[in-house]
């Protein structure tokens, strides 16, 4: 009986990795552990009410910034963290990976984004924190709960993995620029949520932590899947 053919490993230039997803098993464990530990600390602060001390001070300072150019920049930034933008970026990347016969990469993008959306929904339901309604400005207040920030969580879990797959075969300088841009986008998305007053700063920090935690878990599973493929082909 013939054994089914395994999906061939990607041929060509050896990939030179810069950051996430190529961090290996130990790196994935460390990233996930640190991020999830920080999320727990942040969640405890929110539940105990201790986060209010810095939430109010930061929001007061941020809300002093109020001008048309800044508003336009923040509006663009906050759109990058929406479900539509995140889903589109992940979907197009997955399709591109499939067309290149990079099934593991495509699956990783889908799982990372879909899992992040599910985690966001679950966490909001668990904590049920009310949004800072009296501080919202120039934007429609979402009906969902406040903690954690979904825009921040989805951005942290999706953009690094999307950028990684798009530039992983490029030179190290190109990868460095791409991941730096991803980092700036993630930070801008989080800041925009505080700027518009639809989230407390602690919501954004919690979203970042949960997102990076899930990113670490995704990176770990991706590395394990590729290692299994290599072992099967070596038999």
Labelled PLM ranges:
Residues 1-85, 125-142:
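N-terminal transmembrane-helix/juxtamembrane module of multi-pass inner/ER membrane proteins
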Residues 24-26, 95-118:
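Interfacial segments of alpha-helical transmembrane regions
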Residues 29-33, 109, 113-117, 208, ...:
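Alpha-helical transmembrane spans of integral membrane proteins, capturing the lipid-embedded, hydrophobic core
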Residues 36-48, 97-103, 121-127, 191-199, ...:
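Short hydrophobic alpha-helical membrane-entry/anchor segments
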Residues 69-72, 88-94, 160, 186-190:
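Hydrophobic, membrane-inserted alpha-helices
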Residues 78-101:
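Hydrophobic alpha-helical transmembrane segments
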Residues 110-129, 178-192:
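Small-polar-interrupted transmembrane alpha-helices in polytopic inner-membrane proteins
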Residues 134-235:
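Membrane-embedded catalytic cores of phosphoryl/pyrophosphoryl-handling enzymes
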């Amino acid at each position: 009986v013939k054994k089914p053919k395994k999906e061939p490993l990607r041929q060509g230039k050896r990939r030179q990795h810069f950051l996430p997803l190529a961090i290996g098993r130990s790196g994935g464990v460390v990233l996930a552990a640190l991020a999830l530990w920080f999320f727990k600390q942040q969640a405890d602060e929110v539940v105990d009410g201790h986060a209010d001390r810095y939430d109010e001070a930061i929001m007061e300072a941020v809300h002093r910034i109020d001008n048309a150019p800044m508003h336009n920049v923040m509006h663009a930034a906050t759109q990058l963290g929406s479900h539509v933008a995140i889903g589109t970026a992940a979907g197009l990347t997955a399709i591109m990976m499939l067309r290149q016969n990079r099934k593991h990469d495509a699956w990783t993008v889908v799982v990372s984004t879909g899992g992040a959306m599910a985690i966001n929904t679950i966490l909001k339901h668990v904590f049920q924190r009310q949004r800072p309604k009296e501080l919202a400005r120039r934007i429609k207040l979402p009906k969902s709960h406040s903690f954690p920030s979904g825009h921040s969580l989805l951005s942290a879990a999706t953009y690094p993995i999307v950028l990684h797959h798009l530039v992983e075969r490029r030179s190290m300088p190109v990868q460095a620029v791409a991941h730096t841009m991803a980092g700036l986008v993630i930070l801008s998305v989080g800041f925009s949520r505080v700027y518009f007053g639809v989230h407390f700063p602690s919501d954004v920090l919690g979203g970042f932590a949960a997102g990076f935690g899930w990113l670490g878990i995704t990176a770990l599973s991706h590395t394990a899947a590729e290692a299994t493929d290599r072992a099967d082909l070596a038999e």
